[in-house]
Curated annotation (Swiss-Prot):
It holds the Pfam family EF-hand_5. Acts as a calcium sensor. CBL proteins interact with CIPK serine-threonine protein kinases. Binding of a CBL protein to the regulatory NAF domain of a CIPK protein lead to the activation of the kinase in a calcium-dependent manner. Mediates salt tolerance, but only when phosphorylated. Competes with CIPK23 for a direct binding to AKT1, negatively regulating its activity via a protein kinase-independent mechanism. Expressed in shoots, leaves, stems, flowers and siliques. Barely detected in roots. Disruption phenotype: No visible phenotype when grown under normal conditions but hypersensitivity to salt stress. The gene is CBL10. Changing residue 247 to A: Loss of phosphorylation. Loss of phosphorylation. It comes from Arabidopsis thaliana. It is found in: Vacuole membrane; Endosome; Cell membrane. Keywords: Calcium, Cell membrane, Endosome, Membrane, Metal-binding, Phosphoprotein, Repeat, Vacuole. Belongs to the calcineurin regulatory subunit family. Homodimer. Interacts with CIPK24 and AKT1. GO terms for molecular function: calcium ion binding; kinase binding. This is Calcineurin B-like protein 10.
Amino acid sequence: MTTGRPNNILALKISTRSSSLTVGEQFCAVFIPFFAIIDVLVSSVGQCFDCRSTSPRTCQHADLERLARESQFSVNEVEALYELFKKLSCSIIDDGLIHKEELRLALFQAPYGENLFLDRVFDLFDEKKNGVIEFEEFIHALSVFHPYASIQEKTDFAFRLYDLRQTGFIEREEVQQMVSAILLESDMMLSDELLTMIIDKTFADADSDKDGKISKDEWNVYVHKHPSLLKNMTLPYLKDVTTAFPSFIFNTEVED
């Protein structure tokens, strides 16, 4: 099973070869732990959680069809993901909703504790900002990582990851805070000097009007120049969830 802990050899390669990496490649290396976490979330719930939900919440066939239209998944794949969602949502509180403690348990094997990195993952899934992740929000977020999701969807998602204050801009302090939190959770070692250099080069390249922050338009241009930033935002197995997680098909209790 994937552990979600990037190999420290990656950090060594970055520190010893930083001069040969482009700005985009360096910044991409910082992004890798976050996107790996989405992979860990799906695979860990699929393989390790063994609870059965008794929540009265159900998903009607009409809901499955609607979510299939709103995402890159087929109706059968949405149904399979509903089984995965139910496993995660009953791990602590069996109410058919994913609470932050349940997400933390899935990602870090510990239900409690404060972490900016976890907060950002949760906030990006929690579209309604009501403190829980509902199934349709779960589908919408995972759909961004589907191979058929558009480049613009992935670009927008990555922008929101670093726009901590939700001002419509990425500020240097936000990047510093977010990257530090990601590195802390991933055991990825980067020196302060190298991290500062990566952020300096990123803003020098992306902040075209030199106002100290990156707008959405500037971000779009930057990602277009450095497509490697989005390389890890695609999970190939989401193209066929029913094959990747066949047990969900046979365990489904979704009502037609």
